[in-house]
């Protein structure tokens, strides 16, 4: 069953092949969606700061009946956060909103701020600064 299958990443971490995407699920409804998905066998939950539902996702994780270490949680740094300090604060804020001690996968939501998408500045230097904050928080 595909819900029990994983991909192995280069660092040895396993990520479930399928995950519940929570985009456009309201914060006050997402906890129930998370609990139902986990009951069906999902172990990967994907959210983002931009979805504005990390609080509800955190509640769903806490109340789903599956131990945290058996879940894989992904969230994303806002696309317009492009400094080391913004990224660092962003990671801390996600941990607080989700009420988690760690996040399994934290990624940059988009290489350019949504309002600057397709413009000439590709934010290479800025994304390196954001990456440095991600590496600071990475724990294996």
Descriptions of predicted regions:
Residues 1-71, 88, 101, 133-139:
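N-terminal binding-site loop/beta-alpha segment at the start of enzyme catalytic domains
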Residues 16-28, 77-85, 118-123:
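Active-site mouth loops of central-metabolism enzymes
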Residues 24-26, 51, 81, 109-114:
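Feature marks short, surface-exposed loop/turn motifs that line or immediately flank catalytic pockets
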Residues 54-55, 70, 81-83, 115:
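Short active-site-adjacent helix-start/loop capping segments
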Residues 68-81, 102-111:
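A short, structured active-site edge motif that brings together acidic residues
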Residues 88-140:
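Glycine/proline-rich, positively charged
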